[in-house]
Amino acid sequence: MAETDLNALAYKDSDSTDTSSSSSSDEEYQAEVKVSNQNEKQVDYDSDTDLNTDNKVSSVDAYKPCVGENLIIRDSNIIILLRAKEKLCLSGLFDLKIEKGGLLYNDIHFNASSKTYHYWHPLSNSIPEIKSSFYAGFEDVDISAFYAAYDISPNNDYETVLKISNHKSKSLIDGEILMPSLKSLWITKEDFLQKNGYTNFSFDIIMPATLQEITTLNISKSWTNCLQKLKFINQNSIHDTRIMVIGGKNSGKSTFLRSLVEKVLYSHDISDKSVSEMLYLDLDPGQPEFSHPDCISMTRLTSNDMNFGQSFGQASPEVLKQYYIGSPSPQEYPTRYLNMVNKLITEFEDTMFAGISCINLPGWVKGFGLNILQKVLEIYKPTDIVYLESPSTVRHFSELRIPKSFSSTMMTEYSPRSYRIPAEFSNAAINNSPEIKFAPSDIRTYKLLCLFHRSDTSNVPTFDFRPLIAKSPKKISYGRAGIHTIIINIEFALVPSHELIQALEGTIVAIYHEENTDDEHDSSSDIRVLSNDDLETAKFITLGLVHSVDEERKYFNIYVPENMVATLKNLGNRFMIERLSTETPFCELSPPNKVLKTDQTSPFISFKTRKKYEHVWKIRKNIKRKGHHL
């Protein structure tokens, strides 16, 4: 197969030619992205000239807010008016509606319409630019009523008018209550709205001072061409498209996949009213996009979701299947991880999905990580393999054994196409300010907090970040009904069950529902102890935090996500819990002092009542003995 230059196939939009990158290095980009069969030689590139290292918004076209002129502020929303080619960056959680003109976001053009888009822009990730653009629709848009409502003169030279509102999940930014180190995760006090006293918004306009401290997202030409090619192939294929992206740590895998999702779901022809969908296989338990922490999953995404950015797994897409790994790293339980991956991809094959799918993989490309990549490659059988290359990973990628052809449930025989493009380390959120630097462990802890403090019972995520010890846990019986099995590592199998139960207090466990009944165990009131290999009949439901165990009355006091309570009740009384390595957030066991002082309700400490004459220790504060006077 002859090599094909993707530049010739990429869509050329007159208003988007200068949005792929703001750096001069991309203008001088010499290496061409190549697509070929695996058995053909791949061309190399000069990594120093291709990497985009200047991820800053140009001051020439930067939006400069001025209240009363190009910015109108109301109680629950703001109106932003942009002239031609003006661009800005917004952080936080917000809903966006285009009232006039259009905008460019990640090289995707959007027209004014009645649609509302939902954005999740934490400062732990690189922030995409929002750039004004023209209206390219066929239908007339009447904006006169909108102008009248906001006292905007109809005779203005603004190309784009945006309405920005608080996100329905505004309470997600309150995570700093338990983790003060994340106080600048979504917005900072130095940006426009916060600095000028408008503190009721869940978002902010990032000012130049903050822009110098954070990373803005810029998609290079090589990435743009590759993304467009993948979309083009999917649109013109009568079979399914399976995309596997391989790269090292901070190479931009998650960013590339997020851009691919947006390209596939939201970059339609103007007249196309159909709903697009794709399947997302989340195989990175340490940095999952949609899974629970320490889990892998298969998720269905549709163009009706309208979600952009990093939602920390709170965007509420349809999770089709989920497996608990028990650790953020596949390295801790490698056999278990590979078994779960095999099960998940088997579930994917059984769906007979004829659209586009992609895989989010860990950035482990050395040693056993290569074995994982090889195994996933063999069972997923990708139609397209994207290598995010850097000088340190090219050698490891060459060790992968790519078959010349695959056969799947959807196609009898096909050869995988390969793409070698440079990794974009410049898009990694390497922030300069100590206040907006976030360790991966802090982000993992935050995801756990979001899971356990989600308080909604609908598809609109809401959060209550009061400490869990200030709330009453749920009671789940154990023994004959309720939780009838504890699953542990094989090395603890001989530990007596009553000691295991006590050891679970204060730990995070996985909660399963046993789909097949065991009549023999139904007659026993004791709880079973099984090894991790005995999970064939169990379905993972959610994570739980064990508060305490009442061995006399035989029930667990356990915290579970509020939005999962109804699901657990509907499933009946046959549950299993599994303890592995997921760590309990320390801030749940010992919340910041100011949090406990401001909490007006008594924390749930114990279910035991003292006996009538039971001694109570009382601390005397007025003791002044000789030994105390030094």
UniProtKB/Swiss-Prot annotation:
GO terms for cellular component: Las1 complex; nucleolar chromatin. It is found in: Nucleus, Nucleolus. GO terms for molecular function: ATP binding; polynucleotide 5'-hydroxyl-kinase activity. Keywords: ATP-binding, Kinase, Nucleotide-binding, Nucleus, rRNA processing, Transferase. InterPro entries: Clp1/Grc3, CLP1_P, P-loop_NTPase. Residues 1-52 are annotated as: Disordered. ATP binds at residues 247-254. Its EC number is 2.7.1.-. Pfam families: CLP1_P (PF16575). One of its GO terms (biological process) is rRNA processing. PANTHER family: CLEAVAGE/POLYADENYLATION FACTOR IA SUBUNIT CLP1P (PTHR12755), POLYNUCLEOTIDE 5'-HYDROXYL-KINASE NOL9 (PTHR12755:SF3). Polynucleotide 5'-kinase involved in rRNA processing. Belongs to the Clp1 family. NOL9/GRC3 subfamily. This is Polynucleotide 5'-hydroxyl-kinase GRC3. It comes from Candida glabrata (strain ATCC 2001 / BCRC 20586 / JCM 3761 / NBRC 0622 / NRRL Y-65 / CBS 138). The gene is GRC3.
